[in-house]
């Protein structure tokens, strides 16, 4: 591997802006904002709009859209099924 071409991988804190949920993970992204984590160390803070704490798939508040297709509309129009 060539030296100096790979991004710097470090620990950062991600914060869900909708719920305020924070988690520590590794990333190559940096930030000017920092936050003190539970272990007492200071890490860069990256704000995200959606995470597993607020995404409907993970929270169980998922809504399923039911769209009638052409066949369903045909059957409904002509009284079939």
UniProtKB/Swiss-Prot annotation:
Domain of life: Bacteria
Entry similarity comment: Belongs to the bacterial ribosomal protein bL31 family. Type B subfamily.
GO biological process: translation
Alphabetized HAMAP family for the sequence: Ribosomal_bL31_2
GO molecular function: structural constituent of ribosome
InterPro entries: Ribosomal_bL28/bL31-like_sf, Ribosomal_bL31, Ribosomal_bL31_B, Ribosomal_bL31_sf
Keyword tags: Ribonucleoprotein, Ribosomal protein
One GO cellular component, as annotated: ribonucleoprotein complex
Pfam family, one: Ribosomal_L31
Name of the protein: Large ribosomal subunit protein bL31B
Subunit structure: Part of the 50S ribosomal subunit.
Gene3D superfamilies, A to Z: Ribosomal protein L31 (4.10.830.30)
Species name: Bacillus cereus (strain AH187)
Gene name of this polypeptide: rpmE2
